Amino acid sequence: MITADGAWRRGEIVPLKENVDNSLELTEFIESVVVVKRTEQEVNMQEGRDYWYEEIVEKQSAECEPEVMNAEDLLYILYTSGTTAKPKGIVHTQAGYLTGVTTTHSAVFDVKDDDIYWCAADCGWVTGHSYIVYGPLANKTTSVMYEGAPNAPDEKRLWSLVEKYKVNLSLIHI
């Protein structure tokens, strides 16, 4: 499991590590937790299970060979919102999903080398996975990422980010 000590949302700290600790009481399958220092708040670190990201990375080589994957290997599972029924885990595989988001991101946005792209969505949604993370990375797109809500601390936040980072391509899904 990879998490952070916390994250900022609307001026408050979301206790991500504490949430992970609580969820791990429900499973026996997670062996290690890697924690990124983001908010610098005090968190419980379980010896032998929890490791600071920064301490792990400083010991690693700058070189990392990519892992060879089969086309139908699992890429990720994303759960539906559960607004109409119990949330369902949707399995996304390597080749089909990556081909789809690479193609749609390229075709819809017609990204050029000098473009600055921003998708204002939540990474917890399929839109965020697809058009904040995978599509832009696969297309080598210069992207803006931000932490928090697009309307906090006020309704000008979204447009101030567009202006500050000179965004000229965007997908706003809020």
State what each model feature region is.
Residues 1-55, 165-166, 171:
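Structural core segment of the AMP-binding/adenylate-forming
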Residues 122:
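Residue(s) in the substrate-gating loop at a strand-loop-helix junction
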Residues 9-12, 43-44, 66, 88-89, ...:
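A generic structural signal for short coil/turn motifs at secondary-structure boundaries
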Residues 4-6, 88, 118, 143-146:
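Short beta-alpha connecting loops at secondary-structure transitions
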Residues 33-35, 46-79, 86, 94-96, ...:
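Conserved pre-ATP/AMP-binding loop-to-beta segment of ANL
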Residues 98-116, 126-169:
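Conserved AMP-binding/adenylation subdomain of ANL enzymes
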Residues 80, 172-174:
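Conserved small/polar residues in nucleotide/adenosyl-binding loops
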